[in-house]
Amino acid sequence: MRVVSSLFLPVLLAEVWLVSSFNLSSHSPEAPIRLVSQDYENQTWEEYEWADPRDDNEYWLRASQQLSNETSSFGFSLLRKISMRHDGNVIFSPFGLSVAMVNLMLGAKGETKVQVENGLNLQALSQAGPLILPALFKRVKETFSSNKKLGLTQGSFAFIHKDFEIKKTYFNLSTMYFDTEYVPTNFRNSSQARGLMNHYINKETEGKIPKLFDEINPETKLILVDYILFKGKWLTPFDPIFTEADTFHLDKYKAVKVPMMYREGNFASTFDKKFRCHILKLPYQGNATMLVVLMEKSGDHLALEDYLTTDLVEMWLQDMKTRKMEVFFPKFKLNQRYEMHELLKQVGIRRIFSTSADLSELSAVARNLQVSKVVQQSVLEVDERGTEVVSGTVSEITAYCMPPVIKVDRPFHFIIYEEMSQMLLFLGRVVNPTVL
């Protein structure tokens, strides 16, 4: 088994596909991106040169905290939607999906834009200004980028059909706030387009996702891809010498053998008496943390998801105590792909996927333009050195004498977040660590 050099790697890719019924004139594959100048637009971004609405650092701190809370709530809601479709392993990024949708929202107007804001739980924040959401995400991304120990790399590609005209304002805003790299693409030649896009994504994810695209609709006009590469190293690694094959109980009747890591040391943890679950913190270098939620009894993990909220997680964190413990934790790898557009419809984001979509801030030929797909793929690897991956009910929590051993040998949930911003980076569950 190959050992990944930097341990825990979530790789996240969020694709957004825009499809039009127009047949536009042909240009050479090398043709530059066609921008419609502002001089010829009916410009509605009056505050295009918009700066921070306030210079008050306290305001930005409060707004960033609210952004993190709402992104977490959005993530927990999506987890419940995913669980309605299947009960297996899960890994996705609420942060990555929110970034992709807010990037796209720069091109939306009217009810189309409002539905995206509401679906992401960001309608209250957006009232501060037309570009407050992109500005907030930009600040968060810059904070991550400046923290080299965090090991988080992000980026955005826009594969745009060679003769599709986008508004200069959208081009500039998406570049300014999301560092979007635009790549001219001939979607009429689907095999060429597929090869080009897979080449870019394979390179940026360091080979973790070599073939993201299979089939390409020749009517596609724009594909947005946001990616996150997280190479988290445990603050205190597990020693591979102590890793041994052990039993992981899938349920009361089935079990599998997995490589089980072991470490003795000081761990922050607590126990929720109401939900009967252990909560364990596994810190990374660079102020990131994996929170492991392990039910006391095997088979109860799905029931917990109905009650997961930002308030509940905050209570867990506040109640944690650091103790000397023995921890057993399985090595595993996850690779999950989700048709997020179907899930987004369930949280009220529907118009952007219909013929009623208003994307007139994105293109002057926005009539008949709609989003056909939002796809997210995440890869997560966890081993001894770390990770390498491409509002609620108050519960009674009672401090108690933690058992000397926590053995994660049954299905569990994990929450990966950045400590300073409290931003939820990845969320998921492991039901069977031997299955991708």
From Swiss-Prot:
Its main location: secreted. Residues 1-20 form the signal peptide. Phosphorylated by FAM20C in the extracellular medium. One of its GO terms (biological process) is blood coagulation. GO terms for molecular function: heparin binding; serine-type endopeptidase inhibitor activity. GO terms for cellular component: extracellular space. It is found in: Secreted. It comes from the Eukaryota. Pfam families: Serpin (PF00079). Residues 128-145 are annotated as: Heparin-binding. SUPFAM superfamilies: Serpins. Expressed by the liver and secreted in plasma. The keyword Protease does not apply. Glycans are attached at N23, N42, N69, N172, N189, N287. The record marks Y253, D306 as: Essential for interaction with PROZ. InterPro entries: PZI_serpin_dom, Serpin_dom, Serpin_fam, Serpin_sf, Serpin_sf_1, Serpin_sf_2. Keywords: Blood coagulation, Glycoprotein, Hemostasis, Heparin-binding, Protease inhibitor, Secreted, Serine protease inhibitor, Signal. The record marks Y400, C401 as: Reactive bond. Belongs to the serpin family. Inhibits activity of the coagulation protease factor Xa in the presence of PROZ, calcium and phospholipids. Also inhibits factor XIa in the absence of cofactors. Heparin acts as an important cofactor, producing 20 to 100-fold accelerations of SERPINA10 reactions with factor Xa and factor XIa. This is Protein Z-dependent protease inhibitor. It comes from Rattus norvegicus.
